From Swiss-Prot:
It holds the Pfam family GlutR_N. Possesses an unusual extended V-shaped dimeric structure with each monomer consisting of three distinct domains arranged along a curved 'spinal' alpha-helix. The N-terminal catalytic domain specifically recognizes the glutamate moiety of the substrate. The second domain is the NADPH-binding domain, and the third C-terminal domain is responsible for dimerization. CDD domains: NAD_bind_Glutamyl_tRNA_reduct. It comes from Halobacterium salinarum (strain ATCC 700922 / JCM 11081 / NRC-1) (Halobacterium halobium). This is Glutamyl-tRNA reductase. The gene is hemA.
Amino acid sequence: MNGNTGVVSGVRVSHETASLDELAAASAASTEAALDALLEQPPVEEAFVLQTCHRVEAYVVTADQASGRRALGGAGFNPAGGGAISMGHEDSLRHLLRVAAGLESLVVGEDQILGQLRDAYDAAKDAGGIDHVLREAVTKAMHVGERARTETAINEGATSLGTAAVRLAERKTQLADARAVVVGAGEMGALAAKAFASATVAEIVIANRTPARAVRVADMVSVPAEATTLADARGRLDAADVVVTATGSPEHVLPASAFADAGDTVVVDLAQPRDVAPGAGGHDGVAVHDLDDLEAVTAATRERREDAAREVEAMIETEFERLLTQYKRKRADEVIARMYESADRLKSREVQTAVHRLEAESGSLSADEREVVESMADALVSQLLAAPTKSLRDAAAEDDWSTIATALELFNPEFEDGMPFDASRGGDAASAESED
């Protein structure tokens, strides 16, 4: 990674922009594999991937926007793919804040996205994909998400897909004294199990690839619950009245044949890719619902949270401007640091020349005399650059990068790696939306 402040480019595919098939096609085999693919692209300095059951998002930091888009496409995140939305620097940053606040979730204000963001950040950090640009962006996003939930009512009521799935099932069948099966013992499965318990189902079977996690979830609920394996769960469907699936499996975990004798059963598949194989809904009495069918439940939640959402929107804009200011200050500081480095190199040469001349005329200088010469040179550099430093910071705050470019030409700093912004455009590379 270089010392320059780069540009964020992003691409997203979500429940709002794509069909479930398009979402499945955009999903990577794993977050780690996606990060590796992005970081293998030559221009990529940083990378971040967020992949949940209803969204796939990838972000990279590169020297310019065009390089970022090419890198995303080269790693399999095609900005022109089905349902994909390409994002420039500011759009990417604002979108991350909206995601963390829960405004982009299927269930507005849901809490699980914060944990998913933290996990994605940790994965990116472990892969070597996080430096100061994405660190500041994701940290700011999580800060906004926490503020939104503590300072507004954005997460009141049904606050997860797991809860929404149970609400949908409740509209389709009687849950009191029903027999429920939850497939997947992750956070979403646990929330679905708790929601079933609150709906006073008679019993819950919790299935997971690793039974120990299923046991932990079974111990959390207030109704009779049994933990089992995924393989065993297929034989429990005949007795089930309602099934919610939420695994992270890349393949179907419940074949259509498992529902052949299930009879009247409501199935809500929250997974992406789907847990339930196509054709399951063709059996008599079996009704399979997916993420698209949650709209009726989530729309009601969205309406109840409209006032809170407006408060969060205002909060996001304030924090977004603060984030941009952080980046602008960072870019200005990079230019200023290089200017001082250039001045220090010049100062060192001139001090050495002056000392040699003085010693040639008067003999060796004492340590105190040498210190006087060096202190005078330091003071001159500091005083001469104080006003330009303030002007450069003011110019950065106003996005006046042409002024900074002019100042650089006047001071002629000896940049070895180029400018940390695109001076040829007369503007900040981070806000430039260059075309391929």
